Amino acid sequence: MTEVSVETTSAGSESPSIPLPVHIDPADLAAELAVVLSERAGEEYLLYERGGEWVLATGVRAMIELDSDELRVIRDGVTQRQHWSGRPGPVLGEAIDRLLLETDQLFGWIAFEFGVYRYGLQQRLAPGTALARVFWPNGRIVVTREAIQLFGTSTGRRDDVLGVLGDGVPGLRDASAVDVVTDPSNYRDRVASAVAEIAAGRYHKVILSRCLQVPFAVDFPSTYRLARRHNTPVRSFLLRLGGIRAVGYSPELVAAVRHDGVVVTEPLAGTRAFGRGALHDRQARDDLESNSKEIVEHAISVRSSLQEMAEIAEPGTAVVTDFMTVRERGSVQHLGSTVSGRLGTSNDRMDALEALFPAVTASGIPKAGGVEAILRLDEGPRGLYSGAVVMVSADGALDAALTLRAAYEHDGKTWLRAGAGIIEESTPEREFEETCEKLSTLAPYLIARQ
């Protein structure tokens, strides 16, 4: 067992780091710590991978629950309730800022439906629709390839970490793959309806999705470990929060706001399969880079993101960089671009999030028409799907990963969900095939819960 000194730390402080043995994968360790520290105790938690580190937020010291008709802040067994109206961004932002007066980071998720208010479509939501869950954790553990750092954790939890290192991370059971080609939601027919509406001039693009029910309960931490080995996400996450379990491998950022005010979003649009051998991957890439439908889809998405960035950025700072390069994400490859700007002096991170949310690559163009079409044509409320998993910091930073390529569990049901961007040139069969390609990011790697 690794030997280090042990000390009790207060919330926000840190204890001496623990070296990570070279034979232990940091993603495996972080997921196993989620099991040992939270799953077995029935605690809520969120694991978030960003830039070579895995941040595990465990236990709830305070919780912000934003619904379509009420804001609740729960702390020390006391619930403060507030009815609200208007935009959800300022309401959520104010609640977040209050908690960040006492701690340095909060974690949570934001539902797709958070974004309908910007377009005046909130009357379409059912009463009590969940919009966001954000919490102040009791403890936080950061795992990198070199070390483990504990923040606000007790001596007992440090001992648990040392125990996992001493025992080693357990092996994984075999996966139980699910068939991605079933289509009980008549996805092809919905695509055809959208193409007809686009041809009639109602909007230019919409992302329609379909659900794939999983016929068994999923072991989410084990699935995270196995699928992470087969994916190359920009962010990944594992969570049990607000009545939802989820595991996912985010292909893109909805928004990242740095402490110095730089805002970044990374729209991915245009898709082909990946991971089918070097020759097939090269052929698919060549087709992706030359296909007029995919190029048009990407270009109009980037233009929309640039316009949104300009709304909240200092004049002249909104720019596109790394335009239309191929980015590999597990079982698929995409055309991707980076859009950035410097946050205007009259705006804050929630203004940036509201301007960019929901992601253009998960909604439509124009967004108002795309979101309205989704509420009519898509397969039920989206919830966390195409929303965001977020990390918010006291220094003004925000990191919001687009919630795609994920598995979900709620009310005893488990499912995957994937979509495709529909434009006038779309064909139902190809868009269905694209959803199959995206579902294959996770479908082969599901491990059943024992």
From Swiss-Prot:
Presence of keyword Manganese: no
One record GO biological process: catechol-containing siderophore biosynthetic process
Binding residues annotated for Mg(2+), in chain numbering: 297, 431, 434
Entry keywords, A to Z: Isomerase, Lyase, Magnesium, Metal-binding
A Pfam family recorded for this sequence: Chorismate_bind
Active site: 252
Reaction it catalyzes: chorismate = isochorismate; isochorismate = salicylate + pyruvate; chorismate = prephenate
Positions that bind substrate: 270-271, 385, 405, 419-421, 438
NCBIfam families recorded: salicyl_syn (TIGR03494)
Subunit structure: Monomer.
Protein function: Involved in the incorporation of salicylate into the virulence-conferring salicylate-based siderophore mycobactin. Catalyzes the initial conversion of chorismate to yield the intermediate isochorismate (isochorismate synthase activity), and the subsequent elimination of the enolpyruvyl side chain in a lyase reaction to give salicylate (isochorismate pyruvate-lyase activity). In the absence of magnesium, MbtI displays a chorismate mutase activity and converts chorismate to prephenate.
Identification of the protein by name: Salicylate synthase
Organism the protein comes from: Mycolicibacterium paratuberculosis (strain ATCC BAA-968 / K-10) (Mycobacterium paratuberculosis)
Encoding gene, per UniProt annotation: mbtI
